[in-house]
Every structure is written in C-alpha cells, then in structure tokens.
C-alpha cells in the first residue's frame, strides 16, 4: 500500500511540474546595440539602427567607441513608457515592457544623425506620433530609414 501511495505522489508531482513548465512564459531575449564612431551606415551610428523586440526583452546599448550614450527622443516613446538616458561611456541595459516605437539618440551626436529605433511588439500604436516628431535633418533621414527597415 505504501508503494501505491508513493507512486501516486510521484505521479502527481510529475504532472504538477509538467503543468508548470507548459504554463511558464517564454524566456525573454537579450539584444545588443553598439554605439560606433563609424559603421556600415557611416559615421556616428547605432548598430543595428533598427531593432524589433518582444515586450519583456532586454537591450544593452554598448558604447563600443568612447564618447557615446543613449537617450530616448522626446515625443518618440509610447504612452506609459519611461524615458531614459545613460551616462557617457557606460553600457546601459533597458527592459522594454510597453509596446510601441522608441526613438533613441546619442546626446552629443544627435545633430550628426546618431539615432536608432526599437520597436516593441508588432503593432506600434504610437507610430504616427513618432513619424511626426521633429528632428535634425540627418537624424530624421536615419530615423526614416530605420523605420522603413522595420516595415513601417
């Protein structure tokens, strides 16, 4: 009788573990964006310049070359999302939870077009606001290209 009860407990425990594994959410992904003096798209760039992630994913912005930071661009983040700004020359990790499009810039090199786009999720509700934001000419050209690369 003890073996039957023990087997029942083991079997119930196994079922509980299996149920928890099935119910567990997929692990969030980690991405890297490098801040470079020179990249495939020219001088002062984020590589990649556009990135699509899922809510809960993390992006680490890495100043591969010195003198860079990352900061959200005013008017280019989803409602409810928090703006962020890193220090110069420091890696900066962001976990994106609010779906939408985030425009980012390197503060010292914004006028030179050092910008990028992170899209969180598939249907960015703030896309029109992002497209309507005013930016320096070179920055706007690169933002338009980054949005186009994401299919927007």
Swiss-Prot record:
Cu cation binds at residues 68, 106, 109, 114. Its cofactor is Cu cation. This is Pseudoazurin. It is found in: Periplasm. Residues 33-121 form the Plastocyanin-like domain. SUPFAM superfamilies: Cupredoxins. This soluble electron transfer copper protein is required for the inactivation of copper-containing nitrite reductase in the presence of oxygen. The gene is bcp. PROSITE patterns: COPPER_BLUE. InterPro entries: Amicyanin/Pseudoazurin, BlueCu_1, BlueCu_1_BS, Copper_blue_Plastocyanin, Cupredoxin, Pseudoazurin. The keyword Signal applies.
């Amino acid at each position: 009788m003890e073996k039957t009860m023990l087997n029942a407990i083991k079997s119930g425990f196994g079922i509980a573990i299996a149920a928890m594994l099935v119910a567990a959410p997929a692990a969030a992904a980690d991405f890297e964006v490098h801040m470079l003096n020179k990249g495939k798209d020219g001088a002062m760039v984020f590589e990649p310049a556009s990135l699509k992630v899922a809510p809960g994913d993390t992006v680490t912005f890495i100043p591969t070359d010195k003198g860079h930071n990352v900061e959200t661009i005013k008017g280019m983040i989803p409602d409810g999302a928090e703006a962020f700004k890193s220090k110069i020359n420091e890696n900066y990790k962001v976990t994106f939870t609010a779906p939408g499009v985030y425009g980012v810039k390197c503060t010292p090199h914004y006028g030179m077009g050092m910008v990028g786009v992170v899209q969180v999720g598939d249907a960015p509700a703030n896309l029109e606001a992002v497209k309507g934001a005013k930016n320096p000419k070179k920055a706007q050209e690169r933002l338009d290209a980054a949005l186009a690369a994401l299919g927007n």
